[in-house]
Amino acid sequence: MKLAVISDLHGNYYALSAVMEFLRRQQIDGIIGLGDFVTDGPFPQRMMGVLREMQEEFPCYLVRGNREEYLLENLWQPQNWKAGSSTSGLLDYTFRNLTEQDRKFFEQLPTDGVLIGKLDEAGKLVPVFVPQEEVTPDTCRESLFPALRLCHGAPGEIRGNFGLHPELLLSHLENLDASILLGGHSHKQEQKEYAGKTYLNPGSLGLALDDVGGHAHFAILTLENSTWQIECFQIPYDLEGYLAEFDRAELETHGSVLARSLKRTLTCGINYFYLTVKRVRELADALALTDLDEELWEKAERELK
């Protein structure tokens, strides 16, 4: 059995298309998706189209990321996002370009859970996803392959960040009922062993932080002799073609400074997206400002040149 693991696509349908072409040649049996499928990139409907194609072609086991959470929070209670704002313009652009069908799809995504092995009616071993609220002490023990725990940031915390809080990862591994913890969110490919358990972050498919740029990161789990073998991949995609889509969509008119920071991150694999946000908050705190106006964003952008 072969299962691909992807995370943090951030609307990059060029990267997803390249990865799907690669996975077809690998003859995989399914795809695990760890969230952040959309937001920030151009033409959200193109991304949704490739996602639907992926789900039609492969069995998929998907959980929600923090970007989907943001969109749903805006659906349930409007967040005062503004077009053209560096603070919220990219989120607003994505939200306005989603259909009711898309929003319902994100609503039905579980936040986390476990993937276990069972026999189907034909006696074939197949993966079965169990949402976390339905997991019992016996769920992982009864799995016919080493169980996989799926989350975006951390179990029970979509926005949990193991990169900022490594002690949180060790605590979760120590208490893990599954064999492998699969998580994303940091955009950095990583594998760690602790307390007899494994943590795997497949990296970001659409916005990888690798100091290189232009590569989609993901992983493949292969079941051999009742053990998961892990292989991590970094494959190139048509970055120039994707960046040209930013111009066609006039994305800078929607997201201003943050749209430019996103393009820069894609190009070099350094997180200027986060660095810009961080610097804006520092400037705002120093000036005791609560409104992150465009002058602060432009100042932060100049400082990071």
Question: What are these language model-derived features?
Answer:
Residues 2-10, 146-155, 199-203:
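Active-site-proximal beta-strand elements of phosphoester/diester hydrolases
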Residues 10-15, 39-42, 67-72, 114-115, ...:
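Active-site environment of divalent metal-dependent phosphoester hydrolases
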Residues 54-137, 145, 163-172, 177:
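Active-site neighborhood of divalent metal-dependent phosphoester bond hydrolases
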Residues 23-27, 144, 175-177, 220:
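Glycine-rich phosphate-binding loop signature in dinucleotide/nucleotide-binding domains
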Residues 112-114, 150, 191, 218-220:
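Conserved hydrophobic/aromatic beta-strand scaffold that supports enzyme active sites
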Residues 4-6, 11-97:
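Core catalytic region of metal-dependent phosphoesterases/phosphodiesterases
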